[in-house]
């Protein structure tokens, strides 16, 4: 199919629904079940393997300073590619990707999918959002506090298969320090 394999790299079937820990009100998560979204030609479906908890997650949980509720939090996550669109061949650094690879993601450029994270050093780029801090929409799998996340075309993501789970979870917090 144009949208890639219907089973995970581990050989198991991809479920028809996904579960999301949705922040539905201040200090209140609900486990919501949503239909598994379609994977477009430029998208990647990732089975979440782990996610750190950031101070930003705690602020959103306590006060919703960004006015995002309802929201699927979690932006320090990592997981395994279980389905990918036919146009996905390389990550944001140009490294090849395939089913079973471990990835992290940071930004989605909804206004201009041709922008890459490397353009951030060259120009003031607007329209960038962060997974785990996206307003809820019809996809719902927008944060790493879920069992699956849909990385949409136009997102930055990196193949980090050479790292163990703990190291992969620490990539985003360490990147903030650089």
What are these regions (language model features)?
Residues 1-78, 147-149:
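Short N-terminal strand-loop motif that marks the start
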Residues 60, 86, 175:
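Short, glycine/acidic-enriched loop or turn micro-motifs at the edges of active sites
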Residues 35-51, 64-114, 160-163:
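Glycine-rich beta-strand-centered segment in the early N-terminal region that forms part
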Residues 109-178:
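NAD(P)H dinucleotide-binding glycine-rich loop of Rossmann-like/cofactor-binding domains
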Residues 26, 82-88, 153-155:
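Short loop segments at secondary-structure junctions
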